[in-house]
Amino acid sequence: MSVRVGVNGFGRIGRVFARTALRDKDIEVVGVNDLADAKTLAHLLKHDSVHGGLKAEVTAKDGAIFVDGREIRVTAVKDPASLPWTELAVDVVIESTGVFRDTATASKHLQAGAKKVVITAPAKDPDVTIVLGVNEQAYDPKKHRILSNASCTTNCLATTVKVIDDAFGLRRGFATTVHAYTNDQPVHDFPHKDLRRARAAAVSMIPTTTGAATAVGLVLPKLKGKLDGIAIRVPTANVSVVDLVAELEKPVTIQAVNDAFREASAGRLRGILDTCEEELVSVDFNGNSHSSIVDLPSTALIEGNLVKVLAWYDNEWGYSSRLRDLVRFIGKTL
């Protein structure tokens, strides 16, 4: 029996998640809530500037989107507590507005009839934060109703760091994410509380903050306080890369580090972490569903235990693929 899903906020992540879910027989997207109308949302689902056209018939009629004949009810309700999740028999809500990121507000979906809520961002006081491949064993279906899927960068970094720490022990590290621009940046200069993010997204490299490195401690508690990082937003529409420099507990070789990633990608992290032997660039990873793709030719080492690792990630498709997988994971115990 498929998991019935409602999506609150049909922006970049909401729509890309829907694309991944439409391919999955175990998930049925039955409702979308967004302040835009059904015709506009259907158009944006069908035509995507980053991921191309959806290979399906997509239409809008009578307050609904139809994808190859499958109906997705569309509403435009501001208060999540008033959403028709009971009527639609929704099991899991994808909370992707970027607005309802704490337990108090996200729990309104539960009041509306949903069984579980997954917040598509780092959240304030969720029941649990899950990064698949890292700490899914922490999920307790009897206790946890509001989950965070962390961020795209945390999914990449935590997955990468776990391999290093498990194999060699991580003493401390610093991560720089070179990140594609996102919708919270303006096309032209425009006021923003972060003065650097106030600048035109497609013109400059923009240093800014990221909580991804410190958030690793939420899913790998033993590394709490051992990682920090920054972000540099760059003028590309999609695909990002984490540059991790870490001090290890014991001496290693480049071969040993790369072999650890090869082994993980072929084993316990298959489908979540991948490796790349070719000398590729960001556009080559557009549409890649992995949380982390380690760039093996770029691995570097100083004095035996200071290692540099580059890990690519499609910050839209890879992250949305983990959302899909998390919904399936939750669905097993509903």
Regions found by a protein language model. Give the residues of each.
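Conserved active-site and cofactor/substrate-binding residues in soluble primary-metabolism enzymes
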Residues: 8, 39, 88, 104, ...
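Predominant activation on well-ordered alpha-helical scaffold segments within soluble catalytic domains
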Residues: 14, 18, 107, 158-165, ...
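Short, solvent-exposed beta-strand edge segments and adjacent coil->beta transition regions
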Residues: 143-144, 200-202, 239-243, 306-308
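Acidic, glycine-rich segments within the central catalytic cores of soluble metabolic enzymes
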Residues: 166, 170-237
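Short clusters of hydrophobic/aromatic residues that line enzyme substrate/ligand-binding pockets
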Residues: 65, 130-132, 146, 188, ...
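C-terminal active-site/capping subdomain that shapes the small-molecule cofactor and substrate pocket
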Residues: 229, 241, 245-334
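N-terminal Rossmann-like NAD(P) cofactor-binding subdomain of oxidoreductases
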Residues: 1-198, 301, 325, 332-334
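Generic secondary-structure signature for well-ordered alpha-helical cores
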Residues: 22-26, 162-170, 180-183, 210, ...
